[in-house]
Amino acid sequence: MSGTNENLILKYGEPGSIYPRNFTQSAAVGFYRSWKPILIQEGYYDFLLGFESYLEFQKKLSVLAEEPVGVSLALSCMVEVNVAGGILSHATRIQREEQSENLNPNAVGVLDSLWQAFRAGGSTKIFAVGVSEPGWETKLRKLSSTVKDEKLSGTKSFITNGAEADIIFWVIKSEEKNPVYLVRRYQNQTNPNLNSDASDISNQMIEESFHTDFTPLVTHLKLTLCEYPISPEDLVLENYGKLGMELRLKELLSLVSLLIGKIKKVSLENKLVNDEREKLKLWRDNFLGNCQGNPDADFLLSGFPFPTEDLLLALCKHWNLDSPKDLKSMDPDYQLFVWEDQFTQMLIQKKKRKLS
Protein backbone atom coordinates (compact mmCIF):
# COMPACT_ATOMS: atom_id res chain seq x y z
CA MET A 1 0.00 0.00 0.00
CA SER A 2 1.36 3.38 -0.99
CA GLY A 3 1.39 6.15 1.58
CA THR A 4 2.41 8.98 -0.73
CA ASN A 5 0.52 11.06 -3.26
CA GLU A 6 3.46 11.95 -5.49
CA ASN A 7 2.50 12.66 -9.09
CA LEU A 8 3.17 9.50 -11.07
CA ILE A 9 3.61 11.30 -14.38
CA LEU A 10 6.48 13.33 -12.94
CA LYS A 11 7.89 10.36 -11.04
CA TYR A 12 7.77 7.73 -13.78
CA GLY A 13 7.05 9.59 -17.00
CA GLU A 14 9.35 10.36 -19.91
CA PRO A 15 9.35 14.00 -21.11
CA GLY A 16 7.62 14.21 -24.48
CA SER A 17 6.13 10.71 -24.19
CA ILE A 18 2.77 9.45 -22.98
CA TYR A 19 4.37 6.22 -21.76
CA PRO A 20 6.34 5.49 -18.58
CA ARG A 21 10.11 5.90 -18.60
CA ASN A 22 12.01 2.97 -20.15
CA PHE A 23 8.80 1.57 -21.57
CA THR A 24 9.33 -0.11 -24.92
CA GLN A 25 6.53 1.29 -27.07
CA SER A 26 4.50 -1.33 -28.88
CA ALA A 27 1.40 -0.98 -31.00
CA ALA A 28 -0.04 -3.92 -29.07
CA VAL A 29 0.24 -2.14 -25.70
CA GLY A 30 -2.10 0.76 -25.06
CA PHE A 31 -1.63 3.86 -22.93
CA TYR A 32 -3.57 2.66 -19.87
CA ARG A 33 -2.06 -0.83 -20.01
CA SER A 34 1.46 0.63 -20.04
CA TRP A 35 0.77 2.49 -16.78
CA LYS A 36 -1.38 -0.04 -14.91
CA PRO A 37 1.51 -1.97 -13.26
CA ILE A 38 2.75 1.35 -11.87
CA LEU A 39 -0.74 2.27 -10.68
CA ILE A 40 -0.92 -1.07 -8.88
CA GLN A 41 2.52 -0.53 -7.36
CA GLU A 42 1.54 2.95 -6.14
CA GLY A 43 -1.70 1.83 -4.52
CA TYR A 44 -4.31 3.18 -6.93
CA TYR A 45 -6.43 0.05 -6.49
CA ASP A 46 -6.01 -0.15 -2.71
CA PHE A 47 -9.57 1.07 -2.12
CA LEU A 48 -10.92 -1.88 -4.10
CA LEU A 49 -8.74 -4.26 -2.10
CA GLY A 50 -9.92 -2.81 1.21
CA PHE A 51 -6.61 -1.19 2.16
CA GLU A 52 -7.68 2.47 2.15
CA SER A 53 -10.70 4.76 2.18
CA TYR A 54 -12.54 6.07 -0.85
CA LEU A 55 -11.32 9.56 0.07
CA GLU A 56 -7.69 8.47 -0.22
CA PHE A 57 -8.41 7.11 -3.69
CA GLN A 58 -9.97 10.44 -4.66
CA LYS A 59 -6.93 12.33 -3.41
CA LYS A 60 -4.71 10.15 -5.59
CA LEU A 61 -6.86 10.95 -8.62
CA SER A 62 -6.55 14.69 -7.97
CA VAL A 63 -2.76 14.56 -7.82
CA LEU A 64 -2.60 12.43 -10.96
CA ALA A 65 -4.81 14.88 -12.87
CA GLU A 66 -2.46 17.80 -12.22
CA GLU A 67 -0.48 16.81 -15.34
CA PRO A 68 -2.12 16.82 -18.83
CA VAL A 69 -1.31 13.16 -19.50
CA GLY A 70 -2.51 12.37 -16.00
CA VAL A 71 -6.08 13.50 -16.73
CA SER A 72 -6.50 10.71 -19.29
CA LEU A 73 -4.79 8.22 -17.00
CA ALA A 74 -6.91 9.25 -14.01
CA LEU A 75 -10.08 8.88 -16.09
CA SER A 76 -9.14 5.37 -17.24
CA CYS A 77 -8.25 4.35 -13.70
CA MET A 78 -11.33 5.81 -12.03
CA VAL A 79 -13.69 4.20 -14.55
CA GLU A 80 -12.14 0.77 -14.01
CA VAL A 81 -12.18 1.16 -10.22
CA ASN A 82 -15.65 2.69 -9.92
CA VAL A 83 -17.56 0.74 -12.55
CA ALA A 84 -15.84 -2.58 -13.28
CA GLY A 85 -14.49 -2.70 -9.73
CA GLY A 86 -17.87 -1.72 -8.36
CA ILE A 87 -19.58 -4.58 -10.18
CA LEU A 88 -16.89 -7.03 -9.10
CA SER A 89 -17.08 -5.90 -5.46
CA HIS A 90 -20.88 -6.14 -5.42
CA ALA A 91 -20.86 -9.56 -7.06
CA THR A 92 -18.18 -10.85 -4.69
CA ARG A 93 -20.12 -9.62 -1.66
CA ILE A 94 -23.28 -11.38 -2.85
CA GLN A 95 -21.52 -14.62 -3.72
CA ARG A 96 -19.65 -14.73 -0.41
CA GLU A 97 -22.99 -14.47 1.36
CA GLU A 98 -24.29 -17.33 -0.78
CA GLN A 99 -21.13 -19.29 -0.10
CA SER A 100 -21.66 -18.87 3.63
CA GLU A 101 -25.30 -19.90 3.43
CA ASN A 102 -24.82 -22.82 1.06
CA LEU A 103 -21.40 -23.89 2.30
CA ASN A 104 -20.32 -23.99 -1.34
CA PRO A 105 -16.53 -23.54 -1.50
CA ASN A 106 -16.62 -23.00 -5.28
CA ALA A 107 -19.10 -20.12 -5.26
CA VAL A 108 -16.52 -17.36 -5.68
CA GLY A 109 -13.87 -19.17 -7.70
CA VAL A 110 -14.33 -17.22 -10.93
CA LEU A 111 -14.57 -13.87 -9.17
CA ASP A 112 -11.48 -14.54 -7.05
CA SER A 113 -9.44 -15.03 -10.21
CA LEU A 114 -10.63 -11.67 -11.57
CA TRP A 115 -9.30 -9.82 -8.54
CA GLN A 116 -5.74 -10.62 -9.66
CA ALA A 117 -6.09 -7.76 -12.16
CA PHE A 118 -5.75 -5.32 -9.26
CA ARG A 119 -2.93 -7.04 -7.39
CA ALA A 120 0.82 -6.85 -7.90
CA GLY A 121 2.67 -9.72 -9.50
CA GLY A 122 0.08 -10.91 -11.97
CA SER A 123 -0.23 -10.34 -15.69
CA THR A 124 -1.74 -7.00 -16.65
CA LYS A 125 -5.49 -7.32 -17.21
CA ILE A 126 -7.98 -4.54 -17.89
CA PHE A 127 -11.74 -4.68 -17.31
CA ALA A 128 -14.33 -2.46 -18.98
CA VAL A 129 -18.11 -2.25 -18.70
CA GLY A 130 -20.69 -2.15 -21.47
CA VAL A 131 -23.99 -0.50 -20.54
CA SER A 132 -24.81 2.19 -23.15
CA GLU A 133 -26.61 1.03 -26.28
CA PRO A 134 -28.01 2.79 -29.35
CA GLY A 135 -31.43 4.20 -28.45
CA TRP A 136 -31.41 3.14 -24.80
CA GLU A 137 -31.98 6.70 -23.52
CA THR A 138 -30.12 5.84 -20.27
CA LYS A 139 -32.94 3.46 -19.29
CA LEU A 140 -31.94 -0.10 -18.39
CA ARG A 141 -35.38 -1.37 -19.36
CA LYS A 142 -34.65 -0.30 -22.95
CA LEU A 143 -31.49 -2.37 -23.32
CA SER A 144 -31.76 -4.78 -26.22
CA SER A 145 -28.81 -7.09 -25.48
CA THR A 146 -30.10 -10.56 -24.67
CA VAL A 147 -28.90 -14.09 -24.01
CA LYS A 148 -30.80 -16.90 -25.71
CA ASP A 149 -29.72 -20.53 -25.72
CA GLU A 150 -26.41 -19.52 -24.10
CA LYS A 151 -25.62 -17.05 -26.88
CA LEU A 152 -25.32 -13.29 -26.34
CA SER A 153 -26.33 -10.78 -29.01
CA GLY A 154 -26.34 -6.99 -28.83
CA THR A 155 -24.40 -3.77 -29.35
CA LYS A 156 -22.66 -1.56 -26.80
CA SER A 157 -21.99 1.87 -28.24
CA PHE A 158 -19.57 3.46 -25.76
CA ILE A 159 -17.28 1.23 -23.69
CA THR A 160 -14.65 3.34 -21.93
CA ASN A 161 -11.28 1.54 -21.85
CA GLY A 162 -12.91 -0.97 -24.17
CA ALA A 163 -10.23 -1.04 -26.84
CA GLU A 164 -7.66 -2.04 -24.21
CA ALA A 165 -9.90 -4.39 -22.24
CA ASP A 166 -9.34 -8.10 -21.82
CA ILE A 167 -12.79 -8.64 -20.34
CA ILE A 168 -15.96 -6.59 -20.73
CA PHE A 169 -18.74 -6.76 -18.13
CA TRP A 170 -21.78 -6.78 -20.41
CA VAL A 171 -25.16 -5.65 -19.03
CA ILE A 172 -28.19 -7.22 -20.72
CA LYS A 173 -31.99 -7.19 -20.42
CA SER A 174 -33.70 -10.31 -19.12
CA GLU A 175 -37.33 -9.97 -18.09
CA GLU A 176 -37.32 -7.60 -15.08
CA LYS A 177 -33.59 -7.91 -14.36
CA ASN A 178 -30.31 -6.77 -15.89
CA PRO A 179 -27.76 -9.57 -15.56
CA VAL A 180 -24.06 -8.93 -16.17
CA TYR A 181 -21.99 -11.39 -18.20
CA LEU A 182 -18.26 -11.64 -18.83
CA VAL A 183 -17.25 -11.15 -22.46
CA ARG A 184 -13.65 -12.04 -23.25
CA ARG A 185 -12.14 -10.14 -26.17
CA TYR A 186 -10.38 -12.55 -28.50
CA GLN A 187 -7.78 -9.92 -29.55
CA ASN A 188 -6.15 -10.04 -26.15
CA GLN A 189 -6.53 -13.66 -25.08
CA THR A 190 -7.78 -17.07 -26.06
CA ASN A 191 -11.47 -17.46 -25.38
CA PRO A 192 -12.48 -21.09 -24.90
CA ASN A 193 -16.11 -20.19 -25.59
CA LEU A 194 -15.42 -18.96 -29.11
CA ASN A 195 -15.39 -21.07 -32.20
CA SER A 196 -11.79 -21.47 -33.35
CA ASP A 197 -12.65 -20.67 -36.94
CA ALA A 198 -11.44 -17.10 -37.58
CA SER A 199 -14.29 -16.22 -39.90
CA ASP A 200 -16.84 -17.29 -37.28
CA ILE A 201 -15.06 -15.20 -34.65
CA SER A 202 -15.12 -12.11 -36.85
CA ASN A 203 -18.85 -12.60 -37.33
CA GLN A 204 -19.44 -13.04 -33.60
CA MET A 205 -17.54 -9.88 -32.57
CA ILE A 206 -17.49 -6.65 -34.60
CA GLU A 207 -15.39 -3.88 -33.06
CA GLU A 208 -14.91 -0.18 -33.71
CA SER A 209 -12.39 1.61 -31.47
CA PHE A 210 -12.38 5.40 -31.19
CA HIS A 211 -11.16 8.37 -29.15
CA THR A 212 -12.85 11.60 -28.09
CA ASP A 213 -11.40 15.11 -28.32
CA PHE A 214 -11.35 15.26 -24.50
CA THR A 215 -8.99 12.92 -22.65
CA PRO A 216 -7.80 11.73 -26.08
CA LEU A 217 -5.50 9.02 -24.69
CA VAL A 218 -8.46 7.06 -23.31
CA THR A 219 -9.70 4.38 -25.69
CA HIS A 220 -13.38 3.66 -26.27
CA LEU A 221 -15.06 0.82 -28.09
CA LYS A 222 -18.26 0.12 -29.95
CA LEU A 223 -18.79 -3.62 -29.89
CA THR A 224 -21.43 -5.78 -31.53
CA LEU A 225 -21.88 -9.42 -30.54
CA CYS A 226 -23.80 -11.86 -32.68
CA GLU A 227 -24.60 -15.15 -30.96
CA TYR A 228 -21.46 -14.93 -28.86
CA PRO A 229 -21.24 -18.18 -26.81
CA ILE A 230 -21.88 -17.69 -23.09
CA SER A 231 -21.47 -20.29 -20.35
CA PRO A 232 -23.23 -20.27 -16.95
CA GLU A 233 -19.88 -19.41 -15.33
CA ASP A 234 -19.84 -16.12 -17.28
CA LEU A 235 -22.78 -14.74 -15.28
CA VAL A 236 -21.02 -12.41 -12.84
CA LEU A 237 -24.04 -10.55 -11.42
CA GLU A 238 -27.72 -11.45 -11.56
CA ASN A 239 -29.02 -7.88 -11.53
CA TYR A 240 -27.14 -4.65 -12.26
CA GLY A 241 -30.34 -2.73 -11.44
CA LYS A 242 -29.98 -0.16 -8.67
CA LEU A 243 -26.20 -0.57 -8.61
CA GLY A 244 -26.01 1.59 -11.73
CA MET A 245 -26.93 4.73 -9.80
CA GLU A 246 -24.17 4.17 -7.25
CA LEU A 247 -21.57 3.62 -9.95
CA ARG A 248 -22.57 6.72 -11.94
CA LEU A 249 -22.47 8.87 -8.81
CA LYS A 250 -18.99 7.53 -8.07
CA GLU A 251 -17.91 8.48 -11.57
CA LEU A 252 -19.24 12.01 -11.10
CA LEU A 253 -17.59 12.38 -7.71
CA SER A 254 -14.32 11.18 -9.23
CA LEU A 255 -14.70 13.83 -11.92
CA VAL A 256 -14.85 16.37 -9.09
CA SER A 257 -11.46 15.05 -7.99
CA LEU A 258 -10.11 15.28 -11.54
CA LEU A 259 -11.31 18.88 -11.74
CA ILE A 260 -9.55 19.72 -8.47
CA GLY A 261 -6.33 18.34 -9.90
CA LYS A 262 -6.62 19.69 -13.41
CA ILE A 263 -7.06 23.33 -12.44
CA LYS A 264 -4.27 23.42 -9.85
CA LYS A 265 -1.89 25.29 -12.18
CA VAL A 266 -4.58 27.85 -13.06
CA SER A 267 -5.32 28.30 -9.36
CA LEU A 268 -1.73 29.44 -8.82
CA GLU A 269 -2.38 32.32 -11.21
CA ASN A 270 -5.84 33.42 -10.07
CA LYS A 271 -6.99 34.02 -6.49
CA LEU A 272 -10.70 33.49 -7.20
CA VAL A 273 -10.00 30.16 -8.89
CA ASN A 274 -7.73 29.18 -6.01
CA ASP A 275 -10.37 30.10 -3.41
CA GLU A 276 -13.10 28.13 -5.20
CA ARG A 277 -10.77 25.18 -5.71
CA GLU A 278 -9.98 25.09 -2.00
CA LYS A 279 -13.70 25.28 -1.16
CA LEU A 280 -14.47 22.35 -3.45
CA LYS A 281 -11.55 20.36 -2.10
CA LEU A 282 -12.69 21.02 1.49
CA TRP A 283 -16.26 20.01 0.60
CA ARG A 284 -15.06 16.72 -0.92
CA ASP A 285 -12.77 15.93 2.00
CA ASN A 286 -15.48 16.67 4.58
CA PHE A 287 -18.16 14.81 2.63
CA LEU A 288 -16.12 11.65 2.14
CA GLY A 289 -14.59 11.98 5.60
CA ASN A 290 -18.02 10.92 6.89
CA CYS A 291 -17.98 7.75 4.79
CA GLN A 292 -16.95 4.46 6.31
CA GLY A 293 -16.25 1.75 3.75
CA ASN A 294 -17.93 1.80 0.37
CA PRO A 295 -20.04 4.90 -0.42
CA ASP A 296 -23.43 3.61 -1.57
CA ALA A 297 -26.04 5.37 -3.69
CA ASP A 298 -27.96 6.86 -0.75
CA PHE A 299 -24.81 8.36 0.74
CA LEU A 300 -23.60 9.76 -2.59
CA LEU A 301 -27.02 11.14 -3.46
CA SER A 302 -27.03 13.04 -0.15
CA GLY A 303 -24.26 15.26 -1.51
CA PHE A 304 -25.57 15.55 -5.04
CA PRO A 305 -25.51 17.68 -7.18
CA PHE A 306 -21.83 17.99 -6.39
CA PRO A 307 -20.91 21.69 -5.99
CA THR A 308 -18.62 22.32 -8.98
CA GLU A 309 -20.51 25.28 -10.46
CA ASP A 310 -18.74 28.08 -8.56
CA LEU A 311 -15.32 26.77 -9.57
CA LEU A 312 -16.37 26.42 -13.21
CA LEU A 313 -17.73 29.99 -13.16
CA ALA A 314 -14.45 31.22 -11.65
CA LEU A 315 -12.61 29.59 -14.54
CA CYS A 316 -14.97 31.31 -16.97
CA LYS A 317 -14.24 34.65 -15.36
CA HIS A 318 -10.49 33.97 -15.51
CA TRP A 319 -10.66 33.39 -19.27
CA ASN A 320 -13.48 35.87 -19.96
CA LEU A 321 -15.90 33.19 -21.13
CA ASP A 322 -19.69 33.36 -21.03
CA SER A 323 -20.49 29.93 -19.56
CA PRO A 324 -18.90 26.64 -18.48
CA LYS A 325 -19.89 25.18 -21.85
CA ASP A 326 -17.30 27.51 -23.40
CA LEU A 327 -14.43 26.13 -21.30
CA LYS A 328 -13.80 23.46 -23.91
CA SER A 329 -12.43 26.22 -26.17
CA MET A 330 -9.53 26.52 -23.72
CA ASP A 331 -9.08 22.76 -23.30
CA PRO A 332 -11.38 19.98 -24.56
CA ASP A 333 -10.89 18.13 -21.26
CA TYR A 334 -13.23 20.62 -19.58
CA GLN A 335 -16.13 18.86 -21.30
CA LEU A 336 -15.73 16.23 -18.57
CA PHE A 337 -17.05 18.65 -15.98
CA VAL A 338 -20.17 19.99 -17.73
CA TRP A 339 -22.75 17.29 -17.05
CA GLU A 340 -25.65 17.37 -19.48
CA ASP A 341 -26.20 13.67 -20.15
CA GLN A 342 -29.69 12.29 -19.57
CA PHE A 343 -28.75 10.03 -16.68
CA THR A 344 -27.11 12.83 -14.68
CA GLN A 345 -30.09 15.10 -15.34
CA MET A 346 -32.34 12.29 -14.10
CA LEU A 347 -30.29 12.10 -10.90
CA ILE A 348 -30.69 15.85 -10.40
CA GLN A 349 -34.46 15.55 -10.76
CA LYS A 350 -34.49 12.57 -8.40
CA LYS A 351 -32.66 14.61 -5.75
CA LYS A 352 -35.08 17.53 -6.20
CA ARG A 353 -38.05 15.20 -5.69
CA LYS A 354 -36.44 13.78 -2.56
CA LEU A 355 -36.02 17.28 -1.12
CA SER A 356 -39.55 18.44 -2.00
Predicted segment positions?
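Amphipathic, small/basic residue-rich leader segments at the start of a protein or domain
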Residues: 1-78, 273-276, 283, 290-307, ...
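Glycine-rich flavin
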Residues: 20-164, 193-195, 344
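Predominant activation on well-ordered alpha-helical scaffold segments within soluble catalytic domains
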Residues: 58-62, 85, 89, 257-268, ...
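Solvent-exposed alpha-helices and their adjacent loops that cap or buttress functional pockets
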Residues: 121, 138-139, 160-163, 174-175, ...
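A generic structural signal for well-ordered coil/turn residues at beta-strand boundaries
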Residues: 125, 141-143, 164-166, 177, ...
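A short core secondary-structure module
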Residues: 155-204
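Glycine-rich beta->alpha junctions and the first turn(s) of the following alpha-helix
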Residues: 194-196, 206-289
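A glycine-biased, small/acidic residue-tolerant capping/turn segment at secondary-structure junctions
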Residues: 312-333
